[in-house]
Swiss-Prot record:
PANTHER family: GLUTAMYL-TRNA GLN AMIDOTRANSFERASE SUBUNIT B MITOCHONDRIAL AND PROKARYOTIC PET112-RELATED (PTHR11659), GLUTAMYL-TRNA(GLN) AMIDOTRANSFERASE SUBUNIT B, MITOCHONDRIAL (PTHR11659:SF0). InterPro entries: Asn/Gln-tRNA_amidoTrfase_suB/E, Asn/Gln-tRNA_Trfase_suB/E_cat, Asn/Gln_amidotransferase, Asn/Gln_tRNA_amidoTrase-B-like, GatB, GatB_C_1, GatB_Yqey_C_2, Gln-tRNA_amidoTrfase_suB_CS. SMART domains: GatB_Yqey. Signal peptide: none annotated. It comes from the Bacteria. Its EC number is 6.3.5.-. This is Aspartyl/glutamyl-tRNA(Asn/Gln) amidotransferase subunit B. Heterotrimer of A, B and C subunits. The lineage of its organism: Bacteria, Bacillati, Bacillota, Bacilli, Lactobacillales. It is an enzyme of class 6 (ligase). The gene is gatB. GO terms for molecular function: asparaginyl-tRNA synthase (glutamine-hydrolyzing) activity; ATP binding; glutaminyl-tRNA synthase (glutamine-hydrolyzing) activity. It comes from Pediococcus pentosaceus (strain ATCC 25745 / CCUG 21536 / LMG 10740 / 183-1w). GO terms for biological process: glutaminyl-tRNAGln biosynthesis via transamidation; translation.
Amino acid sequence: MNFKTTIGLEVHIELKTNSKIFSPSPVEFGDQPNANTNVIDWGYPGVLPQTNKGVVEAGMMAAKALHANITRTQHFDRKNYFYPDNPKAYQVTQADTPIGTDGWIEIEVEGKKKKVGIAEMHIEEDAGKNSHNPNGYSYVDLNRQGTPLIEIVSKPDIESPDEAYAYLEALRQRIQFTGISDVKMEEGSMRVDVNISIRPLGSEKFGTKAELKNINSFNFVRKGLAFEEKRQQKILLAGGQVRPETRRYDEATGQTILMRVKEGAEDYRYFPEPDLPSITIDDEWIKDVEDKMPEMPGKRRARYVEELGLTDYDAMVLTQTKEMSDFFEATVAQGADPKLTANYLMGDVNAYLNDQKVDLQETKLTPEHLASMVKMITDETISSKMAKKVFKAITQGEEPTSWVKAKGLVQLSDPAVLKPMIVEIVDNNEQSVADFKNGKDRAVGFLVGQIMKQTKGQANPKVVNKILMQELNSR
């Protein structure tokens, strides 16, 4: 029996704002517990929240980036539940009027493109964080309480673990380019919950879904879905029924593990938030947000190809992350050759980042230093071989122009300086001259090697070859 897989993804993205969604408390990652809180975050009676306009505009940007319709009149709702990290006993969210609806993202898997629909996206506040120690004590940190989130809910269009992975990559890329979030799973600014069900091929009725929670990387999302897909298939092939469960992915075993069985839909008793006014978004506000929108990856790729002469592949690689794309643009703005800059970013720079296991912003590399190095290669101040040493220097924060001069690595390109050396070497190697006359090309390589040896590798190979051939042909 063949089966069809249906996957839905709920992605929570922490918005990069200076203050929280309904209170003036700052938003900072890694501060001391409960350092960034106030009476609104603690849920004191009688205190009134106030909506952060920047959060609403970030939600509008996300909607635009994901081709969604912006809801013109919105209100907030209370989602009622009790948990220690939620002192108010409710979460403020958008149950009935999400900020964006009916969007889509294009993905590509194995050369095939597909649009994945986005059902809705809504802004809401995050909860605090519980921690437990071996002595039996539990602690609550409310620094995260009230941090603004946008939850993005996909339509059931994803049909394989690979498509889920591609969707998450595309979503992260587009949100990152808006600048509204760092979208870093390791810091908790992007979190993913997964729903998966299977049904016999040809059946219109969805199967019973399982939910996977607390997955901390895109790769583990893909692996968890692949395992869960096979687990559910085995159950159905054996004549059993899939139970509605919440499961987690175990990285050590590569399996999903039962957390709890869902007995029924939870009743959160939603009702409109009485302490917050509704929000009306008019055409002027939308236009203002559109004017603030940064250039999206697709437009950047097209510009790199049309204006800078890059290949489609180069443009695609450079726009995988906003960080790399911005670094490329800043380097080219310094006068560096676009193609050579792209080659270094995709080659040496990426290799360095992977080797050091760091992001670009965590290194000592700067667009100014990379541009100086690229320009020295272009104007033949240094050779490509010398550039390897220069690149290592700029990863350590060295200014390349002064470093090259201090190390005596400036390439010799002046014919007036090189010609006497070349003539002397040719005069001292009569056998090589004879070999050249007899059609032995290796003789040229030998003579070039002698010249490079005498100049300690600093002679410009192009100039050397030109003068050498002129000298050999004249004899």
